[in-house]
Structures are given as structure tokens and as C-alpha cells.
Design a protein with these regions (language model features):
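TRAFAC-class small GTPase G-domain
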Residues: 1-172
Length: 172
């Protein structure tokens, strides 16, 4: 019998959660997606591990329910879109995204956290610059398992690394 974990995909808005789930993890290409209302749930198997993903919509009102989703999960993947990060830098949405991340960190306490830097095939800012400019390196001092992986659902880069990261959680 395979072990199983539950993982929440979370971000402030349209960072690529559903695309990561369907094109990246499920391998379904050219999926026509609309903004998620509520959540999507899908399960995949990787190296004997059953991984159930909850793709939570970024709409207003859903954020207030984050505690309910986080309570029943084993890990959180927080997505940051590297293709629009410069555009957001001067807008409140960008600031709100990182404020949301800080709130999530307070809620999840010692739950494993992976930051997925998405859409690197269209990136405008390097992962190094994202980490430094927005002080993500301060998250490394957390007591729980933490990581940053850059990925592209379209090229497949980083997808297996995310799955291996999740698989390693169960081994420890």
C-alpha cells in the first residue's frame, strides 16, 4: 500500500496553480483553463507515493478559508510568477502577494513549505533576484522543511524536482 500526502497549491492570484497541476503534474497538454472558483483536487502517484493536490482559487473570500485547507494538508506549495513580477513591483498586488505569503507562514507553523517560482520560460527576473529583492532567504531560518524550486509547466523544467521534494518529505 502506498503512502499518501496532501499538498495545497496556494498563491495570491493567477500564478499558474491550475496549469502546474494539470499540465505539469498530470501531464495533460494544452488544457483550457479558467480562473479556479473554489478548488480543484487531483491525485497523482510518484515513486509509490500518492500525492493529492488541492489547487485553491485565488479569488477574494477564499483566502479567509485558508486555515481550513491548511489544517488538513501535509505540505504547502506557494507559487510566485516570475513572468510578471516586475510589472507587479509597483502595484499593490505584488505587495499583497508577499503579505499573503507571510500570513501563510504564520498559519502553517512547522509544515513543509516549497516556494515554486513559476513560468520561468517567460521570466523577467531571475530566481536569485526574486530571493534577494523580496527577502525570501529569511524563510530559510524556519524550523520546518523549506525549499525553492523554479519550474515551467510548459517545458517541464523543475516538475520532477518538485515531486522528488515531496517524496523526500515522506522518507524523513
Amino acid at each position: 500500500m502506498s503512502k499518501g500526502i496532501r499538498v495545497v497549491l496556494w498563491s495570491f492570484g493567477c500564478e499558474g496553480k491550475s496549469t502546474l497541476l494539470y499540465e505539469g503534474f498530470k501531464g495533460i497538454k494544452n488544457v483550457k483553463l479558467i480562473p479556479t472558483i473554489g478548488f480543484n483536487e487531483e491525485t497523482i502517484n510518484f515513486k509509490g507515493l500518492s500525492i493529492t493536490f488541492w489547487d485553491i482559487g485565488g479569488a477574494c473570500g477564499v483566502k479567509e478559508l485558508r486555515n481550513n485547507y491548511f489544517r488538513d494538508c501535509d505540505a504547502l506549495i506557494y507559487l510566485i510568477d516570475s513572468s510578471t513580477i516586475i510589472e507587479h513591483k509597483s502595484h499593490s498586488d505584488f505587495t499583497d502577494n508577499f503579505e499573503e505569503l507571510k500570513k501563510c507562514i504564520k498559519i502553517i507553523d512547522d509544515m513543509p513549505l516549497l516556494i515554486a517560482i513559476t513560468k520561468i520560460d517567460k521570466r523577467q527576473l531571475s530566481t536569485y533576484d526574486i530571493i534577494n529583492n523580496y527577502e525570501l532567504d529569511k524563510l530559510f531560518n524556519r524550523k520546518n522543511k523549506f525549499g525553492i524550486i523554479e519550474c515551467s509547466s510548459f517545458t517541464g523544467q523543475g516538475i520532477k524536482e518538485i515531486l522528488f521534494w515531496l517524496n523526500n518529505l515522506v522518507k524523513k
